[in-house]
Amino acid sequence: MSQTQPPAPVGPGDPDVYLKGVPSAGMHPRGVHAPRGHPRMISGPPQRGDNDQAAGQCGDSGLLRVGADTTISKPSEAVRPPTIPRTPRVPREPRVPRPPREPREPRVPRAPRDPRVPRDPRDPRQPRSPREPRSPREPRSPREPRTPRTPREPRTARGSV
């Protein structure tokens, strides 16, 4: 590989320098996106998260750039299931002792009932006589003559309209 042109001297004060490789969304020198006169006008290698608009899009916020294998160890308390803090039980007032009960009297078995006296036998029931045909109903009072019913309208499935 022959170099056709010598590499340009890269100094700490050169704001136009890109890192090796194709410039991507986050490969700009520090302060490129900062407005003029912004206090973050620092020259040097680009740092993700330094006022970099692309840092949020690329998934690298720049907060944890220590190393890929760095994991934040959890304290041992975080592994245990959380316990709800219980309020200490308030001791109840001591119960007032009751006076002792009188001892129960033992149950005395009841005297056996006297045997039932048989009832006097009745005559067997006479079979019912067939009903006599009733006389036709008497008409209602004369002041209220019966009027024939008017037929109702047939109901529809939708209900009354």
UniProtKB/Swiss-Prot annotation:
Superkingdom to which the source organism belongs: Viruses
Cellular component GO terms, alphabetical: host cell cytoplasm; host cell nucleolus; host cell nucleus
GO process annotations (BP): symbiont-mediated perturbation of host cell cycle progression; symbiont-mediated perturbation of host transcription; symbiont-mediated suppression of host autophagy; symbiont-mediated suppression of host cytoplasmic pattern recognition receptor signaling pathway via inhibition of MDA-5 activity; symbiont-mediated suppression of host cytoplasmic pattern recognition receptor signaling pathway via inhibition of RIG-I activity; symbiont-mediated suppression of host cytoplasmic pattern recognition receptor signaling pathway via inhibition of TBK1 activity; symbiont-mediated suppression of host PKR/eIFalpha signaling; symbiont-mediated suppression of host toll-like receptor signaling pathway
Disulfide bonds listed in the record: none
Keyword line: DNA-binding, Host cytoplasm, Host nucleus, Host-virus interaction, Inhibition of host autophagy by virus, Inhibition of host innate immune response by virus, Inhibition of host interferon signaling pathway by virus, Inhibition of host MDA5 by virus, Inhibition of host PKR by virus, Inhibition of host RIG-I by virus, Inhibition of host RLR pathway by virus, Inhibition of host TBK1 by virus, Inhibition of host TLR pathway by virus, Interferon antiviral system evasion, Late protein, Phosphoprotein, Repeat, RNA-binding, Viral immunoevasion
Compositionally biased intervals (Basic residues): 30-39
Domain description: The N-terminal tetrapeptide may be responsible for virion incorporation.
Protein name in the entry: Accessory factor US11
Source organism per UniProt: Human herpesvirus 1 (strain 17)
Lineage, top ranks: Viruses, Duplodnaviria, Heunggongvirae, Peploviricota, Herviviricetes
Gene: US11
